[in-house]
Amino acid sequence: PMFKIFSCFPTISDFEGKNEKVHNLLSNDKLTIISLWATWCVPCIKELDAINDVYDDWKEEINFDFFAISVDDSRSQKRAKALANGKSWPYQIFFDKNQDFKRALGTSYIPQTFIIKNKEIIYQHTGYQPGDEEYLFNKLRENETN
């Protein structure tokens, strides 16, 4: 069965510390990639860098949102902000500082990448190997119209 993102899910916060419900951030007709990452997670950063390299090409072909949700604790949030800014990542960056959202998704490992459509998780991937981003793009493409 598809896993839905419900409105009762824990909030995440943006760069300014404003709380947001992921449920409210998702557009029904638009694909959304959610990537759970942290500053101490090398594969996470490799994945986000790899997607950054092809991001503009993806955007030309497909209309999607990308939320990079950091599971860093409060102490590491500054570092996460600096890292994301320093790399000029085009993603919307959010924080899940108590890992409540991550727990609600029932996941314990990062990087953890999801594709969401109509508030349902239609694809989920754990870990990162070079080339995984191509597979992710193909999944986006497959689900864009149907």
Tell where the protein language model's regions lie, with residue ranges.
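Conserved beta-strand segments of alpha/beta enzyme cores
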Residues: 65, 90-93
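Hydrophobic beta-strand anchors of alpha/beta hydrolase catalytic cores
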Residues: 33-34, 66, 113
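Thiol/disulfide oxidoreductase modules built on the thioredoxin-like
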Residues: 82-89, 97-140
